[in-house]
């Protein structure tokens, strides 16, 4: 971010915040490329992208062609091969989109830095812990056990392409940049299959992820504007959690003491939002709006959101995408966990003088479980086991060395144990560990043209020792003096603040 400010500071007064000239600067593509290298990779290491094709020479030739306004670059014909340098035309479009996405993020980033600087007295607030996905679950543990009903919401779809452009008009004042954005949406990609998908979960192609993530995040930010409005109207303290955090894939907000809200034109009181306990959480396209209120209040919230999104985005939003559920009677799939609020019955004996009474006291507890069936389905899709959970070999990795095979299987197991460390029951994780361990052994036996039993007898268990005890080694390093209580710590729920994305196997959708 300091590099961006250094490049932009001399030109801000002259360009009047115009972003379009930056697309002709070479350093923009270099910064976008370096930023892409720093993103978290898949554990399967199968997403090389275009980083190996990046070259400043190609960037210079690309900028020269844009200056010359060569129509061949933007022509839509059957040939996908560019005669200039023999490069694919999709590579040029991808590089332009990466640079453009990096440019249009600048107003959001500068606005975020200025708001955080003023909030902390010119000292930028570091919110790395809030970026972690696991930071959401302690919030759910502390608050959801006291609530009654929840709205399970799916972000509305589809949205017209022009709506996305109009949404960015409030942030990007440069008309040329908006025209270029409109050109990208209509000419280069079929956006209807990427952002306006009718599938339960949104999926992005491996190409141009930065560009589409930016569009999707800006669209979701606009969808949540109603919560931001109510939060700012009802509280004297300005909330920083609702800033345009471009690098975050999730955020949570808490709305307290939502009192009477008056509209500017009609001066009508919105009594349905008078709820002292309202909590909102979102990850990707799924949102949760929980309340301590009654079913009638949640039903009002539901129809308000449906009408608001239909009028604001000019789309047909079905009420079936919002479900009202009671927390104590329903388990929800959220962020790779099956979350629920269950009642723990407990008997208390109370004695008064010579009389004693038995009191049945039920305590609500927030519970998180590992969804075993979808997780086994993900392992089967990745060819680690069958759909019934029987381990099989992975022949694609048979050409690797023994250490690389063990390292890949061990890394997948460690990542899954790391992400699902907050599970209330670890028995499911040990079943996943058994599948990966036996799949690793069968892959090694296939490589050496032997059976699993013969291979283990000949090689011993040294090759799998690190794979078998990886999580115990992590805990032993964290708690070196804890010997008897080590397993007690491991069986308890642990939330980590260094998880910024869901693993491909954890995100089974």
From Swiss-Prot:
GO biological process: mRNA processing; RNA splicing; tRNA processing
Protein function: Usually encoded in the trnK tRNA gene intron. Probably assists in splicing its own and other chloroplast group II introns.
Keywords per UniProt: Chloroplast, mRNA processing, Plastid, RNA-binding, tRNA processing
Entry's Gene Ontology molecular function annotations: RNA binding
Gene name, Swiss-Prot/TrEMBL: matK
Chief localization: plastid
Keyword field contains RNA-binding: yes
UniProt protein name: Maturase K
Gene Ontology annotations for the cellular component aspect, listed alphabetically: chloroplast
Entry keyword annotation includes Chloroplast: yes
């Amino acid at each position: 971010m300091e590099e961006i400010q250094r490049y932009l500071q001399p030109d801000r007064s002259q360009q009047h915040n115009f972003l379009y000239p930056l697309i002709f600067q070479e350093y923009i593509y270099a910064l976008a490329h370096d930023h892409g290298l720093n993103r978290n990779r898949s554990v399967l290491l199968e997403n090389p992208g275009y980083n190996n094709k990046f070259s400043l020479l190609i960037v210079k030739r690309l900028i020269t062609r844009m200056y010359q306004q060569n129509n061949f670059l933007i022509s839509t014909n059957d040939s996908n091969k560019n005669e200039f340098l023999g490069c694919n035309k999709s590579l040029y479009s991808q590089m332009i989109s990466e640079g453009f996405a990096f440019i249009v993020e600048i107003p959001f980033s500068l606005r975020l830095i200025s708001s955080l600087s003023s909030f902390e007295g010119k000292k930028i607030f570091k919110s790395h812990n809030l970026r972690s996905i696991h930071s959401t679950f302690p919030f759910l543990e502390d608050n959801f056990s006291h609530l009654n009903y929840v709205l399970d919401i799916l972000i509305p779809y589809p949205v017209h392409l022009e709506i996305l452009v109009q949404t960015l008009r409030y942030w990007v004042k440069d008309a040329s940049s908006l025209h270029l954005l409109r050109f990208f949406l209509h000419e280069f990609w079929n956006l209807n299959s990427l952002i306006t998908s009718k599938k339960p979960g949104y999926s992005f192609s491996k190409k141009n992820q930065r560009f589409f993530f930016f569009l999707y995040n800006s669209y979701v930010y606009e969808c949540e504007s109603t919560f931001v409005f109510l939060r700012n109207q009802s509280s004297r303290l300005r909330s920083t959690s609702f800033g345009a955090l471009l690098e975050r894939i999730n955020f949570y907000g808490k709305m307290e003491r939502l009192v009477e809200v008056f509209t500017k034109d009609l001066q009508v009181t919105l009594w349905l939002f008078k709820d002292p306990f309202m909590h909102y959480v979102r990850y990707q396209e799924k949102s949760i709006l929980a309340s301590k209120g009654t079913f009638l209040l949640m039903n009002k919230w539901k129809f308000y959101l449906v009408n608001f999104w239909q009028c604001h985005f000019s789309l047909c939003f079905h009420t079936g995408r919002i479900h009202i559920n009671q927390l104590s009677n329903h388990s929800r799939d959220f962020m790779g966990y099956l979350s629920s609020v269950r009642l723990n019955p407990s008997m208390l004996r109370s004695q008064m003088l010579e009389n004693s009474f038995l009191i049945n006291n039920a305590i609500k507890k927030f519970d998180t479980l590992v969804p075993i069936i979808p997780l086994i389905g993900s392992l089967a899709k990745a060819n680690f086991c069958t759909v019934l959970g029987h381990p099989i070999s992975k022949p694609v990795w048979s050409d690797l060395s023994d250490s690389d095979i063990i390292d890949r299987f061990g890394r997948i197991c460690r990542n899954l144990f790391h992400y699902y460390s907050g599970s209330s029951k670890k028995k499911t994780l040990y079943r996943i560990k058994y599948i990966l361990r036996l799949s690793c052994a069968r892959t090694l036996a296939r490589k050496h043209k032997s059976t699993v039993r013969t291979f283990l007898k000949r090689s011993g268990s040294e090759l799998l020792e690190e794979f078998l005890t990886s999580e115990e080694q992590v805990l032993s390093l964290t708690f070196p003096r804890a010997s008897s209580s080590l397993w007690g710590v491991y069986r308890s729920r642990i939330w980590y603040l260094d998880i910024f994305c869901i693993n491909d196997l954890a995100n089974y959708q």
